[in-house]
Amino acid sequence: MANQLVILNVYDMYWMNEYTSSLGIGVFHSGIEVYGREFAYGGHPYPFSGIFEISPGNASELGETFKFKEAVVLGSTDFMEDDIEKIVEELGKEFKGNAYHLMHKNCNHFSSALSEILCGKEIPRWVNRLAYFSSCIPFLQSCLPKEWLTPAALQSSVSQELQDELEEAEDAAASASLASSASGSRTGRHTKL
């Protein structure tokens, strides 16, 4: 299926906007929707991808502090769904969880990078205005705790990634144990499995 719409889903971080809207700065989370899937980025303390997937437009998957604001059609793409998965995987090497920075590498930077690849367009500037203003007003960054901006969906994704790594380690240990047991049985030892 070619010529798929590329949609920017924008979420209002309304609890923060109560404070920043009087300054004319909105604080938004964003993700890119294509092929009925939405990809976004968030921070965590680990050196693997911070990119995660949610149901398009579903703010509840991000957590109670987010609400859906609007969908912006950015263009269309001829990439197939498999290609997009590979692109997102490659972007995950750059957008690692521990590389997240509220002002310099946030969800909106990711959305813009993915959009540029898929349809050749950046996201609208108003979506990431906070990052722009923070470069002009450095103390602004210290006013916004980074941990407030880790979506619940990403926390779930990180937990799953860590669980997968734990299972892989357990499988490797079990395989090593079986190999050891197998070599032990050749030497006359009896091992109960």
UniProtKB/Swiss-Prot annotation:
One annotated GO molecular function: long-chain fatty acyl-CoA hydrolase activity
Keywords for the protein's UniProt record, in alphabetical order: Cytoplasm, Hydrolase, Protease, Ubl conjugation pathway
EC numbers for this chain: 3.4.19.12, 3.1.2.22
Domain PPPDE: 4-148
Region (Disordered) location: 165-193
Function: Has deubiquitinating activity towards 'Lys-48'- and 'Lys-63'-linked polyubiquitin chains. Exhibits palmitoyl protein thioesterase (S-depalmitoylation) activity towards synthetic substrates 4-methylumbelliferyl-6-S-palmitoyl-beta-D-glucopyranoside and S-depalmitoylation probe 5 (DPP-5).
Active site: 29, 107
Source species, domain of life: Eukaryota
Name of the protein this chain belongs to: Deubiquitinase DESI2
One GO process term, biological-process aspect: proteolysis
Catalytic activity, as annotated: Thiol-dependent hydrolysis of ester, thioester, amide, peptide and isopeptide bonds formed by the C-terminal Gly of ubiquitin (a 76-residue protein attached to proteins as an intracellular targeting signal); S-hexadecanoyl-L-cysteinyl-[protein] + H2O = L-cysteinyl-[protein] + hexadecanoate + H(+)
Pfam families on file: Peptidase_C97
Compartment(s) where it occurs, according to its Swiss-Prot or TrEMBL record: Cytoplasm
Disulfide links within the chain: none
